């Protein structure tokens, strides 16, 4: 648990250096209002995940992460071929996910995307069940959420739909969305 405590301290320091979450005054706009801090959060989470690379080698983490990535990609209800290919390339180039053979990652990601495209609610239920399998290992559970945030924020657009999906995944894992500034 010492590693996770260090990560939480780093995140807290990052949040304090940003002056808290309400630094945008009375402006509204959801994720847009905190665009700069979101980018910093994504960068910090990516670094934190990298520091856990040696611990994140289980099949449960791999499968849950691919389910999370598929949910993020399909958060708006559809995944066009260009988006699918873009997310797939981010997955296989992700430092932590390089613990796994790229073909395993592609296969699991595409299976979930296909299910979500065919029947979103059923696919979502199956993906959430896959994610929930990591709930008993807090480091892996948090890493799944962090992976989702990193993938969602990679294009600079962390949409409300993506945030909602990640909040639901937090609930499936028994984690507070506030822990991830959601």
Which role fits each region the language model picked out?
Residues 1-71, 81-182:
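Small-residue-enriched hydrophobic alpha-helices in membranes
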């Amino acid at each position: 648990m010492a590693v996770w405590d260090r990560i939480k301290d780093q995140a807290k320091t990052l949040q304090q250096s940003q002056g808290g979450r309400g630094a945008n005054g009375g402006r509204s706009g959801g994720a847009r209002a905190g665009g700069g801090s979101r980018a910093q959060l994504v960068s910090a989470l990516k670094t934190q995940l990298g520091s856990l690379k040696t611990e994140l080698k289980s099949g449960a983490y791999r499968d849950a992460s691919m389910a999370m990535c598929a949910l993020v990609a399909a958060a708006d209800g559809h995944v066009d071929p260009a988006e699918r290919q873009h997310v797939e390339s981010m997955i296989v180039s992700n430092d932590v996910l390089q613990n796994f053979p790229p073909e395993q990652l592609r296969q699991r990601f595409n299976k979930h995307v296909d299910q979500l495209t065919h029947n979103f609610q059923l696919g979502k239920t199956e993906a959430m069940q896959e994610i929930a399998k990591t709930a008993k290992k807090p480091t892996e559970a948090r890493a799944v959420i962090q992976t989702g945030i990193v993938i969602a924020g990679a294009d600079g657009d962390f949409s409300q739909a993506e945030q909602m999906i990640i909040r639901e995944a937090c609930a499936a894992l028994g984690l507070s969305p506030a822990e991830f500034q959601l």
